[in-house]
Swiss-Prot record:
Record localization: Plastid, Chloroplast
Record protein name field: Putative GTP diphosphokinase RSH1, chloroplastic
Domain of life: Eukaryota
ACT domain mapped to chain residues: 809-880
Cysteines joined through disulfide linkages: none
Reaction(s) this enzyme catalyzes, per UniProt: GTP + ATP = guanosine 3'-diphosphate 5'-triphosphate + AMP
SMART domains from the UniProt entry: HDc, RelA_SpoT
Biological role stated in the UniProt entry: May be involved in a rapid plant ppGpp (guanosine 3'-diphosphate 5'-diphosphate)-mediated response to pathogens and other stresses.
Annotated family: Belongs to the RelA/SpoT family.
Gene that encodes the chain: RSH1
Main location: plastid
Ranges in a coiled coil: none
Keyword tags: ATP-binding, Chloroplast, GTP-binding, Kinase, Nucleotide-binding, Plastid, Stress response, Transferase, Transit peptide
């Protein structure tokens, strides 16, 4: 007898042991089938330790029947001497359920379910066989008879197309074997079965059957697929082939490392799915079947494939809302990557479930009775089911890692899921909407049990980006056992369907369209014939992140390697997320730890380039503020700042940008601004680059470090690098600011305009002299606020006859907020500055204000004052200067 699927030679590094035998004998033969009921990887010796050492499943718990040449047909008797069995396995971690009243009851015990009903959800499957000779009987017709029940929801003409695709795939793969020794055709048929379980349209299923034909054979071409099955099937198969074939071609190039080849492989997959979403849906089904049969790969490849699945494909399934596939991918990946923790955690969950089985059943009964007695639910719903669900194993593991808890400290593993099937709303009134029914049930749950504060999550009012909708609450069902917490999820039948299938529901059944559907137009139907409707808004929300991938590719082509591109997607899109709101209530999701800078560039590149400040929940915050869930973020923009100051500000933000896309956009902006300042900057040097004036080297002087070196050195450098220009004098008359002791004006203060002058190192300059050092944020007063030219005459004064007095100007651009003038005034006073006068004006529309101070103070105090002012929250830029002009000194 040949080793079964799930068992290989004992000499292999990934040798397996069969943990059970199916004692069901085939009709016409007396020998039993040897099979592994559990997933193949569980049988590996490295995993058969601890809890898994005794995980021997009884085949009486499995449902298997043969059909055709060794293929299962549910509900039919065995017809011939075939030797391939299909073991149906419903794993308690993911599929446990029980109902109240007429609903099915199932509780997980050990590794599978003890069932109180005859129906067991056949979700995860393991194939086993007794002899390789059995595969000689496989034919297109026997394969079709096995596949057909899974796609029976299709129309007859659609079934014909799928049947033709199966025959073509069989012809193309005839004679090919998988690593396990089974015919290769089994793989595409199983991919098609997975797609059928999600009730995908016939084009997706046909593409699943044909996805390897062009890559692995010479007899099938894209043109043939298009001629026989249409352009949509070709587009999906072409997207699949581009991904797989590219990696194989690049592997032949010795100059490319395996990491580079894999990165380019993933890059092409991401780009292909932006053109056709079903490319990734078929790819997920392909990866899922490969994970189910991963045991035949060498152990080092098992780990690498499981790692890639966990980092890329499981998060992609989550983004698409396909939680059923996402859960199994995470489960299998966790099992291969960390078998020790997997076994320990699985045993802990089983022990907890057994320990609380009685309490869980009692809670279910109490809730079921309360629902049955509710007259409102009886009026507006056809049926309400209550199911017990064990939390996903990998989800529990991540929670334990996040809280830095040990596996033995885990307590919460059970959930109750309430599924409501509403009646038609005709004539009943507005309270019968699906959302209102869910909120009503939430009130019932909180009326029975004590909810845990801040543990209610409303994903109905604010759905997740992948379309997931549900109400979550955590309660304490028994006050005498306060450590036993129970999560309750409330959703309608349609919400549950979308939660399981996600974007696949849009491509369900016959009513699929290639683009976003029109509002109210059916996009498919489920196996019960119920119409599923996804309007434009819902569909756009689910695939909005695909647009981001497309934009990154278009914007950063040539500037980002394949590794960087894939890293951007895996970190920025597929990692942990935080959800925030725009002022209009739109949901935006960013990677966990993202700042306001990331949010601004997510909205639009120009928004990020012009951002000067932000408000979170109505409060002014710094652009480097780290965002938290449910915050409302408003960006304040201002485009009148000088190129140099914009450069400096964005340079500071660069290190606080979480997303790679935001960092790339900032570096691009910095290069543009550096060009405006006649300076060079590269991506490698951006963190160390300091923008200076064009002729800075002619004027810069060394300044002794001050007491507060960290805060004042930059301002000393900026002030020293500024230039003095005097009317028509040549550039050699320019003097550095450092040599200006204190600008002085001859004469005393008068309201009339007089010729003014300043003394610099004992020399007096008169007439058309003009001194300009406006930095770092404002290039001229007109750029600060357009209305500055039109200020009232009473706000403009001329100074003269003030010999012996120092005059300085400080202009501040800031966000318009309460208390800003007081804070700036306090900062100036604290630095020893005497404020002579101040005037302020604001632009209500943009929320920007300008303050112009006339003050007296020594040069050293000005340096400290500039540093202190810049530390004030909401200050966008400042400028200092003194002016002497025949037309007078502008001062407010």
């Amino acid at each position: 007898m040949q080793p079964p699927t799930g068992a290989v030679s004992g000499s292999s590094s990934s040798s397996l042991e069969c943990v059970s035998s199916c004692r069901t004998s085939w009709r016409g033969g007396g020998r039993p089938y040897e099979c592994s009921v559990l997933s193949c990887a569980w049988n590996a010796p490295r995993a058969l330790t601890g809890a898994l050492a005794s995980t021997t499943a009884q085949c009486s718990s499995c449902s298997h029947a043969e059909a055709g040449a060794g293929w299962r047909r549910r509900g039919q008797s065995q017809r011939s001497n075939n030797s391939l069995l299909h073991i149906t396995w419903a794993e308690g971690i993911n599929r446990g359920k029980f109902g109240y009243g007429s609903s099915a009851h199932s509780f997980p015990t050990g590794n599978f379910f003890k069932s109180w009903s005859t129906s067991v959800d056949p979700t995860w499957r393991v194939f086993c066989y007794s002899s390789s000779e059995s595969f000689n009987h496989i034919s297109p017709e026997t394969l079709w008879e096995d596949l057909k029940p899974a796609i029976s929801y299709l129309q007859p003409e659609e079934l014909n197309f799928v049947h033709d695709a199966l025959k073509l795939a069989y012809e193309a793969h005839n004679g090919q074997k998988r690593r396990s020794g089974e015919p290769f055709i089994i793989h595409p048929v199983e991919v098609a079965r997975i797609l059928g379980e999600h009730e995908l349209d016939w084009e997706s299923i046909a593409a699943g059957l044909l996805h390897d034909t062009v890559e692995d054979t010479d007899m099938v071409t894209f043109e043939r697929i298009e001629n026989e099955f249409g352009v949509t099937v070709r587009r999906i198969v072409e997207g699949e082939t581009k991904v797989s074939k590219l990696g194989k071609l690049q592997c032949k190039n010795e100059g490319n490392s395996k990491q580079d080849v894999k990165a380019e492989d993933l890059r092409q997959m991401f780009l292909a799915m932006t053109e056709e979403v079903r490319v990734i849906i078929v790819k997920l089904a392909d990866r899922l079947h490969n994970m189910r049969t991963l045991t035949h790969m060498p152990q080092h490849k098992q780990y690498a494939i499981a790692m890639e699945t966990l980092q890329v494909f499981a998060p992609l399934a989550k983004l698409l809302g396909m939680y059923r596939i996402k859960s199994e991918l995470e489960y299998l990946s966790f099992m291969y990557m960390n078998p020790g923790d997997f076994a320990e955690l699985k045993k802990r969950v089983e022990d907890l479930y057994k320990a609380h089985e009685q309490e869980l059943e009692e809670a279910n009964q109490i809730l079921g009775e309360k629902i049955a007695e509710d007259q409102f639910l009886d009026l507006v719903s056809v049926e309400t089911q209550v199911r017990s669900v064990c939390k996903e194993l990998y989800s529990i593991y991540k929670t334990a890692l996040k809280s830095k808890s040990s596996i033995n400290e885990i307590n919460q593993v059970a959930q109750l899921r309430i599924i409501i099937k509403p009646k038609s709303c005709n004539g009943v009134g507005p309270l019968c909407t699906a959302q209102q029914i869910c909120y009503h049930v939430l009130g019932l749950v909180h009326g029975i049990w004590t909810p845990i504060p801040q543990a209610v999550k409303d994903y109905i009012a604010t759905p997740k980006p992948n379309g997931y909708q549900s109400l979550h609450t955590t309660v304490i069902p028994f006050l005498n056992e306060s450590m036993f917490h129970l999560e309750v999820q409330i959703r309608t039948e349609d919400m549950d369907l979308i939660a399981e299938r996600g974007i696949a529901a849009h491509y369900s059944g016959r009513g699929v369209v290639s683009g976003p559907v029109r509002p109210g137009i059916s996009s498919g139907r489920n196996s019960n014939g119920k119409v599923i409707c996804l309007n434009n808004t819902g569909f756009a929300l689910r695939i909005g992140w695909l647009n981001a991938i497309r934009e990154w590719q278009e914007e950063f082509v040539g500037n980002m390697s394949s590794r960087e591109f894939v890293d951007t997607i895996t970190r920025d899109l597929l990692g942990s997320r935080v959800f925030v709101f725009t002022p209009k209530g739109e949901i935006k999701n960013l990677p966990k730890g993202a700042t306001v800078v990331d949010y601004a560039y997510l909205i639009h590149t120009e928004i990020g380039n012009k951002m000067v400040a932000a408000k979170v929940n109505g409060n002014l915050v710094s652009p480097i503020h780290v965002l938290a869930n449910a915050e409302v973020v408003e960006i304040i923009i201002y485009d009148k700042l000088s190129a140099k100051y914009a450069f400096q500000r964005h340079q500071q933000w660069l290190q606080h940008a979480k997303t790679r896309s935001a960092r790339h956009k900032i570096m691009k902006f910095l290069r543009e601004q550096a060009a405006l300042s006649a300076a060079e900057i590269t991506a490698d040097a951006v963190n160390n680059f300091v923008a200076d004036l064009e002729d800075e080297s002619d004027y810069e002087q060394s300044i002794p470090s001050s007491e507060n070196k960290d805060y004042t050195f930059n301002w000393q450098k900026i002030l020293n690098s500024d230039k003095l220009s005097f009317g028509n004098k040549k550039s050699d008359c320019f003097l550095p600011v450092k040599n200006v002791s204190v600008p002085k004006v001859n004469g005393k203060h008068n309201k009339t305009v007089k010729e003014l002058g300043i003394k610099i190192n004992g020399s007096t300059f008169r007439g058309d002299s003009f001194t300009d050092f406006i930095h770092p944020g404002v290039s001229s007063s007109k750029e600060v606020l357009p209305s500055v030219d039109n200020w009232k005459a009473g706000k403009i004064c001329a100074w003269h006859n003030t010999e012996g007095s120092s005059i300085q100007w400080l202009c501040i651009v800031c966000v318009d907020r309460k208390g800003m003038v007081a804070e700036v005034s306090s900062a100036l006073t604290a630095c020893g500055i005497t404020i002579c006068s101040c005037v302020a004006e604001r632009d209500k529309r943009r929320g920007i204000g300008v303050m112009l101070f006339h003050f007296e103070g020594a040069y050293e105090n000005v340096v400290s004052a500039c540093s202190g002012v810049d530390m004030i929250l909401g200050v966008l830029g400042w400028s200092v200067g003194c002016s002497c002009n025949p037309l007078g000194v502008l001062e407010c």
